[in-house]
Design a protein with these regions (language model features):
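Short amphipathic alpha-helical segments and helix-helix/interface helices
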Residues: 30-34, 68-69, 95-99, 186-187, ...
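Conserved beta-strand termini and adjacent loop/short-helix elements that scaffold enzyme active sites
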Residues: 9, 47-49, 109, 200-204
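Short, flexible, basic/aromatic active-site loop/helix in glycosyltransferases
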Residues: 122-136
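Short catalytic/ligand-binding loop motif for oxyanion handling, primarily in non-cytosolic enzymes
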Residues: 15-16, 53-55, 91-94, 99-100, ...
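GT-A fold catalytic core of metal-dependent nucleotide-sugar glycosyltransferases
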Residues: 60-122, 146, 151-152
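Conserved beta-strand scaffold positions in the cores of enzyme catalytic domains, especially
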Residues: 44-46, 82-84, 106, 197-200, ...
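Catalytic core and acceptor-binding pocket of nucleotide-sugar-dependent glycosyltransferases
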Residues: 66, 137-249
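N-terminal anchoring/stem segment of glycosyltransferases
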Residues: 1-80, 256, 261-263
């Protein structure tokens, strides 16, 4: 019987400890996704060892995108849908099963967090993709996406694209464009290959930059319920945009507050 898969990405690049302030938060975010799998009878696949050891030539963000099918198939899993989940994501203990909302399409969430960054990234990669006119309104974030076997060929060809042009991509991401790794190339590849991407799932399933949206606050005017907005109204909490050296501390504090719900 086919099962849905949570492909959780938790590779520790020790060379970036100073930049990211350690990876202690992995254990807390991972626990929420294991709980999800137990609730909804899904396979939990932990991608914690890179297939390519050179993390400069093969960034973690690239490896998660181009090797998801390879890793899952190597485990002999009879998979249905796959949710690729970054380690910065935490799922609420009683939130719904998003796999039931996909219509078996490729699912992503539109990225509006930094439109200038997105525009510059799109323009920077445009010459590589033969000046393809990418529809910016359908640009998605690659940190949480859902796909299935119907998208295997597209994702495997994306892997070939990178492996055949990795020196060019490294130059673009590290020297010329300096706006992301896999995300913008993946958006180009999905649109070039006419992949039908479902982008209308509620934002509750992907709350990003929560501090900028005041989601860590609560309704102080009523002063009845001090539950932060992101817990009350969100399902999938993404801890990005926070100073990276503070991320583990913030997530640990949250985990200590809510962990009893996952027992």
């Amino acid at each position: 019987m086919k099962r849905n898969v949570i492909f959780w990405v938790g590779i520790k690049n020790e060379n970036h400890n100073d930049k990211y302030g350690d990876f202690k938060y992995f254990e807390y975010t991972k626990a929420t996704w294991k709980h999800f799998c137990k609730r909804f009878d899904c396979e939990f696949v932990e991608f914690n060892e890179p297939l390519q050891k050179d993390l400069t030539e093969y960034r973690v963000n690239w490896q998660k995108a181009i090797y998801a099918f390879d890793v899952i198939e190597s485990l002999g899993i009879d998979y249905d849908q796959i949710a690729l989940v970054d380690s910065t994501c935490m799922y609420k203990w009683d939130a719904p099963n998003f796999f039931e909302l996909t219509d078996h399409k490729f699912v992503g969430w539109r990225d509006f967090d930094n439109m200038n960054w997105i525009y510059q990234s799109i323009q920077g990669y445009k010459p590589f993709f033969n000046d393809f006119k990418l529809n910016m309104t359908n640009y998605i974030n690659s940190g949480f996406i859902i796909f299935n076997e119907a998208h295997r060929e597209t994702m495997q060809s994306f892997k070939e694209l990178y492996e055949n042009n990795k020196q060019v991509f490294m130059q673009l991401q590290d020297v010329i464009v300096k706006k992301g790794n896999d995300q913008t190339p993946l958006n180009y590849w999905l649109q070039i290959n006419n992949v039908d991407v479902k982008t209308d799932l509620p934002m509750a399933y992907k709350l990003t930059h929560m501090h900028r949206r005041d989601l860590f606050k609560y309704n102080w005017q009523l002063n009845v319920d001090q539950t932060p907005y992101f817990i009350k109204y969100g399902y999938n909490w993404i801890f990005n945009g926070i100073p990276k050296h503070e991320r583990s501390q913030v997530i640990e504090q949250l985990w200590n507050f809510i962990k009893h719900n996952y027992e």
